[in-house]
C-alpha cells in the first residue's frame, strides 16, 4: 500500500511540475495540487503526523477547483491502473502459493515412494536368503535319492544271488518257501517306495520354500502386532494395579488420620478467613484507587497471588498432618511429643502469617507512593483526563470512604491486630488527605486552563466558519 501511495504521489508531483504557469487559473491549480500533496503526505505519515498549513485548508475548501483538477489530470484512471496492478500481484501470489503446495505434495509422494522402495528392497534381500536355504535343502535330498538307489541295487543283487543258489533243491520246505515269498515281496515294496519317493520329493521341495517364505514374511507383521497388543495390555494392567494400590494407601491414610481431621479443618477455616480479609482489603484499596484514576489491579493481583500461595501451602501442611499417625495409637510419651510438635508448627505458622502481613502492608505503602507519583505525572501529561476524573469523584462522592467501611468486615478473632490496622489506616488517610488537597488545587487550576482552551477553540472554529 505504501509503495502504491508513493507512486501516486510521484505521478501527481510530475504532473504538477508539468503544468504551464501562464494564467492565474493555472497558478491556483498548482496551489491546490500542492495542498493535495500535503494532505496525502500527512495521511501517510501517521506515526508522526505533519500538520497541514492553514493556507492549504482555505484553498481546499473550494470543491469545484479540486474536482476540475482531478478530472483534468486523469487521476481516476491512474488510481484504476494501480488497482489493476494490485489485483495482478495478488493473483501472482496465489499462483506461487499453489505451486509451492504442489511441490510439497510431490516431495511427500517421493518420500512415500522411496520408503516403499526401501521396503521392497528389504523383502528382496530376505527372499535370496530363503532361496539359498531351499537350495541347501534340495542338495541333501539329491544325496539321499542317490543313496537309496545304491541300496536298491545292492538289494536286487542279493535277491538274484539267493534265487540262483537254491535251484537244485527239488522240494523246498514250506518255511523256506514262505521266507522266499517274503523276500520276493520285500524288494518289490522297496522298489515301489523308491519309485514313489522321487515323485514325492519335488512336491516336498516345492513346499519347503513356500513355508520358509511364509514364515519369514508372516512373523514380521503379525508378531509385531501381537507384541504391541501384549505390551498395551500389560501397561494397562500395571496402571490399574498402581491405581488400586494408591487408592488402598489413601484409604489407609484416611483411616489412620481420622482423629486429626478436626484441627486440620480448623486451620483451613482460619486461613480461609485470612484469605477473605486479604480480598476485602484489596477491594477497599481498589475503590480508593478508582477515585484517583487507578483500578487497583496492581495491588489486587500480587495480594491475591500471595493469598493463593499461602492457602495452597497450608493445604499441603494439612495433608501432611493427615498422613501422619494418630495420637491415640501411641503410648503417653509419643503422644506428648506429637502434641509438642503440633504446637511448634502452629507457632511457626502464626509467625509466618505475621511476617507475611507485615510484608504485605509495606508493599501496600510502596504501591500507594508509586500510584501517587504516577497520578501526578499523568496530571501533568494529560490534564483533560485528570479533570474528568476529578469531576467524577466529586459527583459520586467516592473521595473519603471512612475507616468504618474498612473495619466493618473484620473478624472478632483478632481484635488487637484489627485496631492496630485501623489506626495505621487512619494515619494513612490523614497523609493522603494532605496530598489530595494539593491535588485538588492542581485539578482546579487545570480545569480553569481547560475552560480557557475550550473558549479559544470555539473562537477559532467561528473564525474559520466566518
UniProtKB/Swiss-Prot annotation:
Modified residue annotations for Glycine amide: 332
Acidic residues: bias regions: 233-247
Residue spans of biased composition, Basic and acidic residues class: 131-155, 248-259, 305-314, 351-378, 412-440
GO cellular component: chromaffin granule; extracellular space; neuronal dense core vesicle; perinuclear region of cytoplasm; secretory granule; transport vesicle
Glycosylation: residue positions: 433
Disulfide bonds: 35-56
Keyword flag Disulfide bond: yes
Modification Methionine sulfoxide, positions: 387
Cell compartments where the protein resides: Cytoplasmic vesicle, Secretory vesicle; Cytoplasmic vesicle, Secretory vesicle, Neuronal dense core vesicle; Secreted
Chief location of this protein within or outside the cell: cytoplasm
Compositional bias annotation for Low complexity: 92-111
Family: Belongs to the chromogranin/secretogranin protein family.
Oligomer status and interactors: Self-interacts; self-assembly is promoted in vitro by chondroitin sulfate attachment which occurs at mildly acidic pH conditions. Interacts with SCG3; this interaction is optimal in conditions mimicking the lumenal milieu of the trans-Golgi network, i.e. pH 5.5 and 10 mM Ca(+2). Interacts with ITPR1 in the secretory granules.
Protein name: Chromogranin-A
Species assigned in the record: Rattus norvegicus
Gene (UniProt): Chga
